[in-house]
Amino acid sequence: MKRALLSVSDKRGLIDFAKGLIKNNYEIISTGGTLKFLTEAGVKAKAVEEITGFPEILNGRVKTLHPKIHAALLAKRENSEHMKTLEEHQITPIDLLAVNLYPFKETIEKKDVSYDQAIENIDIGGPSMLRSAAKNARDVIVVVDPDDYDSILKAIANDDLSHDFRRHLQAKTFRHTAAYDALIADYLSKEEYPEKLTVTYDKDFDLRYGENPNQTAAVYADAIPKAYSILQAKILHGKKLSYNNIKDADAALRTIADFQDQPTVVTLKHMNPAGIGQAITIEKAWDKAFYADDISIFGGIVVLNREVDLATAQKMHTIFLEIIIAPGFSEEAYQILAKKKNLRLLTVAMTNTLPKELELTSVLGGAVVQEMDRLVENAADFEVVSSAKPTDEQLEALVFAQKAVKHVKSNAILIAAQGQTLGIGAGQPNRIDSVKIAFKHAEAKKNFDQAVLASDAFFPMDDSVEFAAEHGIKAIVEPGGSIKDKDSIAMADKLGVVLVFSHNRHFRH
């Protein structure tokens, strides 16, 4: 008869699994709550204490940390010395170990959880047994996932416990314990950039392909859910998102997070805003975002920060969109939008601010890590450096434009008026070209006479200020900081335009 040790916090499928093991000539030993759960269901099982001859102590902190458990897991069956040692100490080998760990993640997700509560949910015995069993996976079947129970029972029944199958379970176990420890380390870490960066993500699903069809890809979600995360979105209608959909939707959600004070709509293509509109109603905000660029929006993504109503849905229904994201949809809005088979409708929880977390970007051989750009632009932080002073309306427009340009790929120039982007110049190697592209889109707009201009970084020369002023711009905001700032200020004064320094750069690569 073989022996299996079962000690789990997640009891899904456990009864059927234990019964299947008994049917295949396994003796069951167990601990604490798992033992009680099994015996109450009529499954015959022995307590670990019967095996070790030692009781649980320290309120359950020490249950399985015993040589009769770990030797039973670690002994190599083909090693005669190992087996002789087991016999001398009257230790029966353990052939299968099923363990899942104390719910540390679920504990720290609870509101107002204390440090002591979190610490008490750090499993010690479980990871120790798993590591012992996984090290000896050639002889011990190691199980961390209830979803594997059926395949394991089938393999046992068919005597098909191949090397590859055991290796698969072994690797899965070490990933499981590594992720568990990474989560604990992250919770306890106070250093922003510790000497070891431990991160853990859970696989969500495989993608058909990555950025291009020749690239494989999959989606992994943060172990702890975050606000504004596209990976926490609920798909109400349509198929799963693609790699590019996810990247674009993430960029759109990051953008709209800066505009929670009023109803706002962001349209986006290829991780750049196509249009941003802000108004007193979500319908009017849609109108502004749509007319900001009614060409680029085709096949794009739309994110709204208020519930989608019928009037807004009727307007969106007339054009081809890939994805619409909002906190919610009225029943009437949903019914009209869901008529389009290939349109995805998603809901995402939106709070006042983005979560504070580090951003990781892979480079060959490693990663660069930085704090997320969560800076909130405020007119109180602006410095007027020109002789001309902004009106209240201009100042409001400058704040809006500076918030928006933060989300455009560098070199970034954005022209805006009255809560609406009019023209966006993105991703050019030199700033003056971005200026010209922005003007190409903006000049024909009916409210261009009210337009202001924002730049994500300083002007290295005065040519951008000169071009903007000569083409009708009356107010400009930029970070400042160039060795030639004086030239830009002089040009602004010469041409009578307002120049404001925000002192905050927003490069986006």
Curated annotation (Swiss-Prot):
A Pfam family matched in the record: MGS
Molecular function as annotated in GO: IMP cyclohydrolase activity; phosphoribosylaminoimidazolecarboxamide formyltransferase activity
Paired cysteines (S-S): none
Pathway: Purine metabolism; IMP biosynthesis via de novo pathway; 5-formamido-1-(5-phospho-D-ribosyl)imidazole-4-carboxamide from 5-amino-1-(5-phospho-D-ribosyl)imidazole-4-carboxamide (10-formyl THF route): step 1/1; Purine metabolism; IMP biosynthesis via de novo pathway; IMP from 5-formamido-1-(5-phospho-D-ribosyl)imidazole-4-carboxamide: step 1/1
Highest taxon in the source lineage: Bacteria
Assigned GO CC terms: cytosol
Stretches assigned to the MGS-like domain: 1-144
Annotated GO biological process: 'de novo' IMP biosynthetic process
Keyword terms of this UniProt record: Hydrolase, Multifunctional enzyme, Purine biosynthesis, Transferase
Reaction(s) catalysed by this chain's protein: (6R)-10-formyltetrahydrofolate + 5-amino-1-(5-phospho-beta-D-ribosyl)imidazole-4-carboxamide = 5-formamido-1-(5-phospho-D-ribosyl)imidazole-4-carboxamide + (6S)-5,6,7,8-tetrahydrofolate; IMP + H2O = 5-formamido-1-(5-phospho-D-ribosyl)imidazole-4-carboxamide
Keyword field contains Chaperone: no
EC number assigned by the record: 2.1.2.3, 3.5.4.10
Free-text domain note: The IMP cyclohydrolase activity resides in the N-terminal region.
PANTHER family: BIFUNCTIONAL PURINE BIOSYNTHESIS PROTEIN ATIC, BIFUNCTIONAL PURINE BIOSYNTHESIS PROTEIN PURH
Family statement: Belongs to the PurH family.
Protein name as catalogued: Bifunctional purine biosynthesis protein PurH
Gene that encodes the chain: purH
